[in-house]
UniProtKB/Swiss-Prot annotation:
Keywords: Secreted, Signal. Tooth-associated epithelia protein that may participate in structuring the basal lamina at cell-tooth interface. Residues 1-15 form the signal peptide. One of its GO terms (cellular component) is extracellular region. It comes from Mus musculus (Mouse). This is Secretory calcium-binding phosphoprotein proline-glutamine-rich 1. It is found in: Secreted. Expressed in enamel organ.
Length: 90
C-alpha cells in the first residue's frame, strides 16, 4: 500500500505543471476553444486561365422562342453529347 502511495505521489510530482492563467474554474476561453482556429483560404494574386469555349453547332437553325418538338429536342441533345464525347475523348 505504501509503495502504491509513493508511486502516486511521484507521478503527480512528475506531471506537467498547470499554467497559472488556466488554473481554477473554467474560463470562457477553456469552454469555447474547442476547435482549431480557422485558416483563411489562399487566393492567388492573378486570375487562373480559363478553358477556351468550344462552340457547339446546332443541327438546325435554333430560335429561342420556338417550341421544340420531342424529335428536335432529342436531335439537339444527341448533337451536344456527340460534341462532348469528342471533347472528352470517349
Amino acid at each position: 500500500m505504501q509503495l502504491f502511495l509513493l508511486a502516486a505521489l511521484l507521478s503527480a510530482a512528475a506531471a506537467l505543471p498547470i499554467p497559472l492563467g488556466q488554473s481554477g474554474g473554467s474560463s470562457s476561453e477553456q469552454r469555447f476553444n474547442l476547435y482549431a482556429p480557422q485558416i483563411l483560404p489562399f487566393f492567388p494574386p492573378f486570375p487562373l486561365p480559363q478553358a477556351p469555349l468550344i462552340p457547339i453547332p446546332f443541327p438546325f437553325p435554333f430560335d429561342p422562342n420556338q417550341v421544340l418538338t420531342p424529335n428536335q429536342l432529342l436531335e439537339l441533345i444527341t448533337s451536344i453529347l456527340n460534341q462532348l464525347q469528342g471533347f472528352l475523348g470517349r
